[in-house]
From Swiss-Prot:
Membrane-spanning parts: 5-25
Protein name according to UniProt: ATP synthase subunit b
Species this protein is from: Chromohalobacter salexigens (strain ATCC BAA-138 / DSM 3043 / CIP 106854 / NCIMB 13768 / 1H11)
The keyword ATP-binding is assigned to this record: no
Signal peptide stretch: none
Amino acid sequence: MNLNLTLIGQAIAFAVFVWFCMKFVWPPVMQALQERQKKIADGLDAASRATRDLELAQEQAAEQLKESKEQAAQIIEQAHKRANQMIEEARDNARLEGERMIESARGEIEQETQRAKEELRTQVAALAIQGAERILDSSIDEAKHRELVDKLAAEL
């Protein structure tokens, strides 16, 4: 085996090159790779956190939407109940007012009927007295006659 000085020189140059690379080139390259690896890992973690946060936000939004819909449904239901209650109250008030008006009208009719009966009795009594005076054409005691007519009128 012939070893040339060139081969030994190349081996020494290669060893110096390797040592130089290990000492000065390799650490910054490794540091850059580690920093890049850390950035990628941080980015993936951030993306994972963002995904979880997005899912959580979507769940919260869906829950709030559901609660809002339930509240809206409750408000609408309460409004319907209140409207129905107001309608029922108005119907009851109208019915009571109608009954009161009917009773008032009945009372007025009864009063008018009584007044008309009294007026009729008075007129009948006056006509009876006039008729009796003409028939008898005599003097009858006015007080007794009036008493008899009042009794007859009361019987009518």
